[in-house]
């Protein structure tokens, strides 16, 4: 939910028509639901994400990122959707690589034995290249 309002706490509940018939007015709510600051943040993000070409650009960046990752000899495989990317390594452990990346200015996560990349949708190509260079140096 963090990305829903650009880092401002907000949540959303999506339901199909059958469930919506059960959730009638006043049957679902929260103490701080509808906070105007959170809603303004959510609306701003929604407007940005639905603007012309935004998601196409994010998809192009994801493809570019995956292509650059696949060029690294130590990379065994790449999984994920869009810019949510998991990388399997041939020999090094994800935990060790993750720590070394952080020590060199690249913040990534792990999921079991995969490196997890979760950049923002508005990441730049230069930022992708910088991250790739750090990863390459760590994997040498």
Question: Which residues make up each language-model segment?
Answer:
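Conserved N-terminal phosphate-binding loop of PLP-dependent enzymes in the Aspartate aminotransferase
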Residues: 1-140
């Amino acid at each position: 939910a963090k990305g829903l309002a650009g880092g401002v706490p907000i949540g959303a509940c999506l339901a199909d028509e059958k469930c919506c018939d059960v959730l009638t007015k006043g049957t679902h709510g929260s103490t701080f639901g509808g906070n105007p600051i959170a809603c303004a943040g959510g609306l701003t993000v929604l407007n940005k994400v639905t603007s012309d070409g935004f998601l196409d650009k994010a998809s192009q960046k994801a493809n570019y990122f995956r292509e650059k990752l696949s060029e690294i000899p130590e990379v065994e495989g790449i999984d994920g959707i869009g810019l949510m990317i998991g990388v399997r390594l041939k020999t090094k452990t994800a935990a060790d690589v993750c720590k070394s990346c952080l020590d060199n200015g690249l913040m990534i996560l792990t999921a079991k034995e995969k490196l997890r990349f979760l950049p923002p949708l508005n990441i730049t190509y230069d930022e992708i290249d910088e991250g790739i260079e750090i990863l390459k140096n760590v994997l040498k």
